């Protein structure tokens, strides 16, 4: 499982990352955190999609809420947790189906409980297929895939929203159930 943490304050970012790693260890789930200091960095360097996004609401250029809107255009099933200093922004988080909204300063036990609940939900969610090639790691949920075909060293995944085409072979499929 891949987890994105987008937080511009290094201390908070490190604290959340350690908490996530502890929760992964407790649940026995395999996972990897990737940390970003801005929404732009996540969009540019991140290998989306991620199963879990932990986002700071207030960032310099692109806010966590704007980033979440972008995430929802690509992945309606990801779990999103917001962090912020301002509880009055909580209502906007519901527009992007946020899982939880943490108000800073974040108590370590509260963060731990929220992350544990999020991981349980992810584990209980639907099954998915993962394709891995040199450029990208792509996850497709079973109920979104209409058909998968292989043609001339290319894999074409037909989904509800669009078709994805990339070089690879069917042997690169990892079905996770």
Stretches found by the model and what they are:
Residues 36-43, 173:
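Short alpha-helical segment
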Residues 24-38:
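Short hydrophobic/Thr-rich beta-strand motif most characteristic of the beta2 strand and flanking loop
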Residues 7:
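Conserved acidic carboxylate
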Residues 113-177:
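Conserved binding/recognition cores within well-folded domains
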Residues 37, 103, 168:
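Short loop/edge segments at beta-strand edges and connector loops
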Residues 1-4:
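Non-catalytic signal-transmission and effector/linker regions of two-component phosphorelay proteins
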Residues 10-17, 90:
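Charged phosphotransfer/docking patches of two-component systems
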Residues 41-44, 50-124:
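CheY-like receiver
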């Amino acid at each position: 499982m891949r987890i994105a943490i987008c937080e511009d304050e290094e201390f908070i970012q490190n604290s959340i990352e350690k908490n996530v790693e502890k929760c992964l260890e407790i649940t026995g789930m395999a996972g990897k955190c990737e940390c970003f200091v801005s929404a732009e960095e996540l969009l540019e360097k991140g290998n989306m999609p991620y199963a879990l996004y932990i986002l700071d609401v207030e960032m310099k250029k692109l806010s966590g809420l704007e980033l979440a809107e972008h995430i929802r255009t690509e992945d309606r099933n990801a779990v999103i947790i917001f962090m912020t200093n301002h509880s009055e922004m909580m209502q906007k988080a519901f527009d992007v189906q946020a899982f939880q909204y943490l108000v800073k300063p974040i108590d370590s036990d509260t963060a731990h409980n929220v992350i544990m609940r999020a991981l349980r939900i992810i584990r209980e969610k639907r099954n998915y297929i993962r394709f891995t090639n040199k450029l990208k790691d792509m996850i497709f949920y079973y109920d979104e895939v209409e058909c998968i075909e292989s043609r001339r060293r290319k894999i074409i995944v037909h989904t509800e929203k669009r078709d994805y085409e990339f070089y690879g072979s069917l042997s690169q499929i990892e079905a996770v159930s």
